[in-house]
Regions:
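General "foldedness" signal
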Residues: 144, 217, 224, 228, ...
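Extended amphipathic alpha-helical segments with heptad-repeat/coiled-coil character used for oligomerization
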Residues: 184, 188, 197-265
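Ser/Thr/Asn(+Pro)-rich, low-complexity disordered segments
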Residues: 1-125, 137, 148-159, 251-383
């Protein structure tokens, strides 16, 4: 299928051509969230070559050191629990799993598994990983982690509550082409790796929500309309979420290629979705084509970032035959001191596709009114 072709293209790049050097750019102190850059290589290597692949098996052992293994939070734990649940019989999983689990379980500061703080996508990564770690602890090491069943129940409750809130209020990081893959990776891991059928169902519901959000706004490799927490993405298939959109729905105006030895982390992060058994519903795939919603206006609203003040943010999104235009209005001020990461409106115009070239993009015009680096903007510029 076309999806399998796109998925394999991403897997091949990350397994074979994505820059890998376990002693350099990928070390555990710079950046501290080394899992963001390393774990996709493990996933791709196991997915393409099997669980005995030497390259894939070197990473868990390499990072099982006192200084590295302490960094058990968001980007790190979500990738490793994806690996543990998908490739349980890999030699490096068998030899390292208890060390990683113990380090994560025993962390008690504000980056701990069960009550950690952070952004919305940080919590999504950490809590989904906490559930899977609790499942592993309960099933494989019950004597070492006697409270595993209690923690598993607590995390199930959190997952259920958060999913219900998603469908009630929407996310705080709505339509974010920067953080989409980080918001869904843990739910992909649950969809494939949770043993509780209720948890798998709720993971499916969360993934369907995000897939529908992408499908509605996606045009020729670009996330259209308003975005919460984004600071780039003005060309087709260059941003994190746009690679997920391309994987799920295709429709790129250009040829997608990957340079051997490059560090395209935006593409590499999509390997979790490429390796998962999750597929968007056919209704969502059809929505992405826009065929049945031409010349339609979509209205919605969102709460503020912490989901308080429901409906405060008003959104409109128009789907024309050759373009989309979306805007969001935030009726509160306080845009001072730094990057608000709100992209308040965006126009995306279609172009004639040419898959023989690699440098073509849909036309994009972006409203910077609510997104400026280190400049106070006050309220919205059209107030």
């Amino acid at each position: 299928s076309e999806f399998k072709y796109r998925a394999q293209k991403i897997i091949n790049y990350v397994a074979d051509d994505y820059k890998w050097d376990a002693s350099g750019w990928y070390n555990c102190n710079n950046p501290s969230d080394y899992g963001k850059y390393n774990w996709p290589i493990v996933v791709a290597s196991f997915q393409k070559y099997g669980i005995n692949n030497p390259k894939g098996n070197q990473y868990l052992t390499h990072f099982n050191t006192e200084s590295c293994i302490y960094n058990r939070f968001h980007f790190n734990v979500v990738g490793e629990t994806y690996i543990f649940t998908h490739y349980w019989d890999a030699p490096s999983v068998k030899s390292n799993i208890k060390d990683y689990l113990t380090a994560a379980w025993n962390r008690t500061d504000s980056y701990n598994l069960f009550t950690s703080e952070g952004t919305e996508n940080h919590l999504a990564m950490t809590r989904t990983a906490a559930y899977l770690y609790a499942q592993i602890a309960k099933d494989s090491f019950p004597n070492d982690f006697p409270n595993a069943a209690q923690k598993l129940a607590e995390m199930k409750s959190w997952l259920m509550d958060w999913a219900a809130m998603l469908y009630t209020s929407g996310p705080g990081e709505w339509n974010s082409s920067t953080y989409l893959p980080f918001s869904i990776t843990g739910w992909l891991a649950l969809y494939d790796g949770a043993k509780d059928p209720d948890v798998r169902l709720v993971a499916r519901a969360v993934l369907d929500y995000y897939a529908a959000e992408v499908a509605l706004h996606y045009t020729q490799g670009i996330t259209g309309g308003y975005e919460s927490r984004n600071s780039s993405g003005y060309e087709s298939v260059v941003n994190y979420g746009d690679y997920v959109g391309w994987l799920w729905f295709g429709e790129s105006p250009k040829k997608i290629t990957f340079t051997p030895g490059s560090q395209n982390n935006e593409a590499a992060t999509a390997v979790y979705a490429a390796s998962s058994t999750y597929r968007p519903p056919m209704a969502v795939v059809k929505l992405a084509s826009k065929a049945d919603i031409l010349n339609s206006m979509y209205y919605n609203s969102k709460g503020e970032y912490l989901l308080n003040n429901p409906g405060a943010i008003k959104q409109t999104f128009y789907v024309g035959k050759t373009f989309t235009l979306g805007a969001a209005y935030l009726p509160y001020g306080g845009f001072t001191g730094g990057d608000t990461q709100f992209q308040m409106w965006k126009f995306v115009g279609k172009v004639a596709p040419d898959t023989t070239i690699t440098a073509k993009t849909a036309n994009v015009i972006v409203g910077y009114g609510g997104k400026e680096w280190n400049k106070a903007r006050g309220r919205m510029p059209w107030d």
